[in-house]
Amino acid sequence: MTGNQKPNRVVVIGGGYAGALAANHVRMRDDMAVTLVNPRPKFVERIRLHQHAAGNYDAAIGYDSLIGDDVRLVVDTATRIDAVARTVELASGDTLDYDYLIYAVGSTGTIPASVPGAAEFAYPLAEFEQAERLAARLADVPLSAPM
């Protein structure tokens, strides 16, 4: 980047696998200023949530070990994207301006309503909070209980 030129502002919404990888890739260019927006302060290894629920692995990893020092982490939730104004509104009331936007919010698991009792008794493992819920339940189950 030359003298008075301002860096392009890149906002990445979503700090999962795709968002963290995109932020790290884009930051390698010296003409980009990268902001990563994620509702959690830690990266969640979704493929390890079953181990987290069983108490064998901590699936939450600090972003300081995953993203470059020059990536700004904003722990917040994007609530609105204004493509004309090139802004992202956050749940906190803050607004981020961008030149480029990467939308990498990932996926979520759902419990089918067509399965009787699933909503009340199933423990899905698609999200960190779900793994925490199952871990708490498993901690209450005696070791002798059948599973």
Go through each PLM region and give its residues.
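Short beta-strands and strand-loop turn motifs
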Residues: 46, 146-147
